[in-house]
Swiss-Prot record:
InterPro entries assigned: NadA (IPR003473), NadA_sf (IPR036094), Quinolinate_synth_A_type3 (IPR023515)
SUPFAM superfamilies: NadA-like (SSF142754)
Taxonomy, superkingdom: Bacteria
Gene Ontology MF terms in the entry: 4 iron, 4 sulfur cluster binding; metal ion binding; quinolinate synthetase A activity
EC class (word): transferase
EC number of the protein: 2.5.1.72
Keyword entries, A-Z: 4Fe-4S, Cytoplasm, Iron, Iron-sulfur, Metal-binding, Pyridine nucleotide biosynthesis, Transferase
Positions of iminosuccinate binding: H47, S64, Y142, V143, N144, S163, H257, P258, E259, T274
Name this polypeptide is given: Quinolinate synthase
Swiss-Prot/TrEMBL cofactor(s): [4Fe-4S] cluster
Length: 369
């Protein structure tokens, strides 16, 4: 099955309505029964942004790459039920064996940021950038991207990046070529490049809709070309949010994810990956005060886990990631019962040609220290 077939089948095999009528107790009992029956043959990774009702059944929690790597090391599992979004399940499929079956409980669980860069747009951008800059551009893609985009990057000598290793990967990329095309999240690219000492005046933005480069200046000065994409959740944190919490309590620590805008990151006390945010709160002194700028399910979980600290969301009106939230207890149960019947649905299988090139991008990242 090609990756395009997988994407087009997102609405196939919809969960029967009867699952929504079950009580949480009924669903939990049936989920645990299947987990016990399958034992090590079943592995459920759960992303940090998942609801508590799902995370309680996860065999491992982490960010997208951590979970894919954990799945890769798990040679016993016949079925990997990935509680995350589509691109995460794709990465897990590419890093696991052909015999292992990766399942996404709800095929509608996509990622708006990953969908902001498709192959038609990327090929068009590459064509124009090559005309402008010749062979001086290397592509990097955030792991929050489709398998096809990772494959494009791999074919063209680039690598994938995470929010944890973005600085290291940009440094490596600039040792390879004069310029970087950073996909699909402009904010992570901009914040990371700025931290490395690259001024905003040397960063341009590629608009895939208008198919043009946004830059006021001499083209030869451009070092970073940022794809005009963003995370719909993290872009909602604002400078006004920071000013509001600081005016209310000057002692509060503001920590945000680098997918937030540059203005928000610049005004925050700390910024970093999901892991850095979690570690920072874990290591903070009792009684310390924190306003966190990241996904609401994770913030709520951190608040519950640290009653000795004063923690709140930087934006009190923030909603959880809507696509991540498509994975819920009814969909998890349905997915597991389909596996139990021998009729798994929501199977993610990346075309081998795409996987081969995408793995190049992933492996380059994993080997660069």
């Amino acid at each position: 099955m090609s990756i395009l077939k997988v994407i087009h089948d997102r609405n196939a095999g919809m969960m029967p309505e009867v699952y929504k009528e079950l009580t949480e107790e009924e669903m939990a009992g049936r989920i645990l029964k299947i987990k016990k029956k399958f034992g090590a043959r079943l592995f459920i990774p759960g992303h940090h942004y998942q609801k508590d009702e799902v995370i309680q059944f996860a065999d491992a929690t982490g960010d997208s790459l951590q979970l894919a790597q954990v799945a890769q090391k798990n040679k016993k599992a016949e079925y990997i039920v990935f509680c995350g979004v589509h691109f995460m399940a794709e990465t897990a499929d590419m890093l696991t064996s052909d015999e292992q079956i990766v399942v996404l409980p709800d095929m509608r669980a996509g990622c708006s940021m990953a969908d902001m860069a498709n192959m038609r747009q990327t090929n068009r951008a590459w064509e124009e950038l090559t005309k402008l800059f010749g062979d001086t551009v290397i592509p990097l893609t955030y792991v929050n991207s489709t398998a096809e985009i990772k494959a494009f990057v791999g074919r063209n000598g680039g690598a994938s990046v995470t929010s944890s290793n973005a600085a290291r990967m940009l440094t490596w990329a600039l040792s390879q070529k004069e310029r970087i095309l950073f996909l699909p999240d402009q904010h992570l690219g901009r914040n990371t490049a700025f931290d490395l000492g690259i001024p905003l005046s040397r960063m341009a933005v590629w608009d895939p809709i208008a198919e043009k480069l946004e830059y006021n200046g001499d083209m030869k000065d451009i070092i970073i070309i940022l794809w005009k994409g963003h995370c719909s959740v993290h872009e909602k944190f604002t400078v006004a949010n920071i000013k509001s919490v600081k005016e209310r309590d000057p002692d509060i620590n503001v920590i945000v994810h680098p997918e937030c805008t540059h203005e928000v990151v610049a005004l925050s006390d700390f910024s970093g990956s999901t892991k850095k945010i979690i570690d920072s709160i874990n290591e903070a002194k009792p009684g310390s005060k924190w306003a966190i700028g990241t996904e609401m399910n994770l913030v709520s979980r951190i608040i519950q886990e640290h009653p000795d600290k004063q923690i709140e969301s930087l934006n009190p009106d923030m909603c959880p990631c809507l696509t991540m939230n498509r994975i819920d207890m009814p969909h998890l149960l349905w997915s597991l019962e389909q596996i139990d019947k021998g009729e798994p649905t929501g199977v993610i299988k990346v075309d081998q040609d795409i996987a081969k090139d995408a793995i190049l991008a992933l492996n380059r990242m994993l080997t660069i220290r």
